[in-house]
């Protein structure tokens, strides 16, 4: 049986691939081995309050807060970002079946009292399944951003950024809300940053797990935010096309789930495995349900994968489609790479090359499915017009298809 391995691009293009953002990283708490230690080397520290436990996290372990007095207190250089400077705060949050716990749960806050004086906070509201964050200097200068969370996810990757007067909220690497204040908000105060501890009498303590907490003295952009997006509890394969009779292996991100269930089960080698081999016979949307059965109340995550199945006997090699423009460096899957639109129609591939306007070759494909990311020798190329040349055989005859494309940035 032939198996197509689907390699997933998890990092950015060219020289940026695989880099972790360390510029202006002021504090980083991975919570690895159940330790509250600043791995940035900048010397922030903290204290664990209550009997906070550690559970499975997105990398190693995360701190679990049971909503009954568990909390963290953080001090040190990380507090310096909460002044008038630009900043970013990013972390992973896993919610649980919280039963009777309702109201506004304080995920984290740097706030002396229940007022708007020099305050920063991030809250989760269970009733509306909403994450929100506020910054305020006083009762006339403040702003709040908020977004609903995906009810089919257990882990959520949350990032807030402040750039001058603009305050933004990203969920799973996607901008969900952004507001502009009438002036830059000064957050300077001596209050420590507290995690999972209520500020106001109507607040509830946070009930869930936190992991991979980072503080930056800069406003990260969307690409930088996504370099830390581990996509927990997701199917990493992109929606794809395969030949009838072929198979592929499903790949899921690291997960803390105890049970897996694929539906439909037809063509799935093991419907209870995280990474089964799938052999579809018709276009199918596969749904993976990941179940947490630990003592935190449990949780369900769901993700889907669309697989189109093509019978090679129905393809016409005389009709090959190639786009005329693309935008490398944009969000993955949004016209960010260039290649043959229907590569399965090229059943006897010879070569596919791209040239700059001086005739220099900047890309040579290994097969019909290869795609160009807009780089040459690891460096992004300038916007402009490029030429392509596809050489292949169709019905036993050699064919040459040429044209131009525009690289946009």
Question: Can you annotate each of these PLM segments?
Answer:
Residues 133-157:
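Short, aromatic/His-centered strand-loop micro-motif at the edge of beta-sheets
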Residues 23-26, 36, 40, 68-132, ...:
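Extracellular glycan-recognition modules
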Residues 272-287, 371:
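Solvent-exposed segments in extracellular or luminal domains encompassing
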Residues 153-162, 169:
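Short tryptophan-centered beta-strand motifs in secreted/extracellular beta-sheet-rich domains
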